């Protein structure tokens, strides 16, 4: 119902060399895309969809009349849906490095002597590289300015990078369940996932296709680890609890709990459709993402007293040190105070760097977070909002109450879907209107 129907992917070849951030060059590359809706005469109704880690170009519709699995964002894209294909021309592109048709590790390396796949020789790519190829795609489609660039999770990072790198080429930026950069904890999760693949004996240093093997066990474990971070404790408790698959303990290492069965199923299904080398480079692209890297503010530490108001430093320290404090107590208090000041300084520097990264952007923003998302918590979205507001950018923010954790951005949640639709359909604000329109939709919670 309200589907875009059967869609046919298109493959576009780019003959020009592509220099990547890692200083390596692809001699040529291909991008596979899907489009939905009709581009209007002045090409002002185009919306770009950026996919997440395991996503692809197939965001909506079906590949045949018998296809039972719709695109990964079919509840968002279609006639009269949040991204209305009666109104917009929607483009979803599969990024290079993926395993769903665009040039990646499973593609033939044109520089190999025996027409072998790239495998581990495919260069590491970044969010910035992806956005660069998407801009090249825009040129090929003769779309000068996108009505909006939209993405969830890693797709949201691409939308942010678009705003920073091509400020005049998009009017709206929709960032959903995302973050300005990965935390140490998130990098750690990615490293555990990578090591599960790298340590699989069938990985063969990434040349498993040539060896006729496949690191299936490693990829299964990697997906199991990742999937846990997409869910919430409450959701897992409600769905599985401590339910046993057979109703009794089997006193062995086979699947006993329902949650074990679920995770293994998710891992096995993923391993059948995804490439291990692609998983490795996708997670590294996540780790590398940091739109503030191009700004020296992130490298220059400022004195604490220039970041925290003098009266705050004085009052907080004096009030916490009593006249009869022992030398040890005094030392501890001073140390605790220094820790607090260091945190304040760090937060200030992060905000300053983000402000610098987005100060030159020209688009309007919608930032969406979900209350139960602990992979990219609402606080991370609020960092983006704070930086945008501090630079006077027009930004709307909504923190949606949803039980699905990080995966909430894939669910049909009325308040969330309504916010996206309203934002995309609203008239573009002039500069004068923008100055008076900074708003946050929904309370911070």
UniProtKB/Swiss-Prot annotation:
Biological process (GO), any one: methionine biosynthetic process
AB hydrolase-1 domain location:
45-411
Domain of life, per lineage: Bacteria
User: Which pathway does it operate in?
Assistant: Amino-acid biosynthesis; L-methionine biosynthesis via de novo pathway; O-succinyl-L-homoserine from L-homoserine: step 1/1
Q: What is its EC number?
A: 2.3.1.46
Q: Which residues form the active site?
A: 153 (nucleophile), 373, 406
Q: Where is this site: Important for acyl-CoA specificity?
A: 375
Q: How does it assemble?
A: Homodimer.
Question: Into which family does the record put it?
Answer: Belongs to the AB hydrolase superfamily. MetX family.
| Protein name (Swiss-Prot/TrEMBL) | Homoserine O-succinyltransferase
UniProt organism field: Psychrobacter arcticus (strain DSM 17307 / VKM B-2377 / 273-4)
């Amino acid at each position: 119902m309200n589907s875009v129907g059967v869609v046919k992917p298109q493959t576009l070849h780019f003959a020009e060399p592509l220099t990547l951030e890692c200083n390596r060059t692809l001699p040529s590359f291909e991008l596979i895309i899907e489009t939905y809706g009709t581009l209007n005469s002045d090409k002002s109704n185009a919306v770009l969809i950026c996919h997440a880690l395991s996503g692809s170009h197939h965001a909506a519709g079906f590949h045949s009349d018998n296809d039972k699995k719709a695109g990964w964002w079919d509840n968002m894209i279609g006639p009269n849906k949040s991204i209305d294909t009666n109104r917009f021309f929607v483009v979803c592109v599969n990024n290079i490095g993926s395993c769903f048709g665009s040039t990646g590790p499973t593609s033939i390396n044109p520089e190999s002597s025996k027409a072998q796949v790239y495998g581990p020789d495919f260069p590491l790519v970044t969010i910035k590289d992806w956005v660069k190829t998407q801009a090249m795609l825009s040129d090929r489609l003769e779309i000068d300015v996108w009505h909006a660039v939209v993405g969830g999770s890693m797709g949201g990072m691409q939308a942010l990078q678009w705003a920073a790198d091509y400020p005049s080429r998009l009017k709206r930026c929709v960032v959903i369940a995302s973050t300005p950069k990965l935390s140490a904890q998130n990098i750690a999760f990615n490293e555990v996932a990578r090591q599960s693949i790298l340590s699989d004996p069938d990985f063969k240093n990434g040349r498993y296709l040539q060896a006729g093997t496949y690191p299936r066990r490693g990829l299964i474990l990697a997906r199991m680890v990742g999937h846990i971070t997409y869910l919430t404790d409450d959701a897992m408790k409600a769905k599985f609890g401590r339910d046993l698959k057979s109703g009794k303990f089997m006193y062995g290492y086979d699947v006993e709990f329902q949650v074990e069965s679920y995770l293994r199923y998710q891992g096995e299904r993923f391993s059948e459709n995804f490439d291990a080398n692609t998983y490795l480079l996708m997670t590294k692209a996540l780790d590398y993402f940091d739109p503030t890297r191009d700004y020296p503010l992130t490298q220059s530490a400022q004195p604490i007293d220039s970041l925290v108001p003098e009266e705050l430093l004085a009052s907080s320290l004096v009030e916490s040190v009593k006249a009869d404090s022992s030398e040890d107590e005094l030392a501890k208090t001073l140390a605790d105070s220094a820790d607090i000041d260091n945190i304040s300084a760090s937060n200030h520097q992060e905000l300053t760097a983000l402000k610098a990264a987005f100060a030159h952007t020209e688009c309007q923003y919608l930032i969406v977070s979900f209350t139960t998302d602990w992979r990219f918590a609402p606080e991370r979205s609020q960092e983006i909002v704070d930086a945008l507001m501090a630079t006077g950018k027009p930004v709307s923010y909504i923190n949606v109450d949803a039980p699905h954790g990080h995966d909430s951005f894939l669910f049909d949640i009325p308040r969330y879907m309504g916010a996206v639709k309203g934002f995309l359909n609203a008239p573009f604000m002039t500069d004068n209107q923008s100055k008076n329109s900074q708003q946050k939709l929904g309370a911070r919670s």
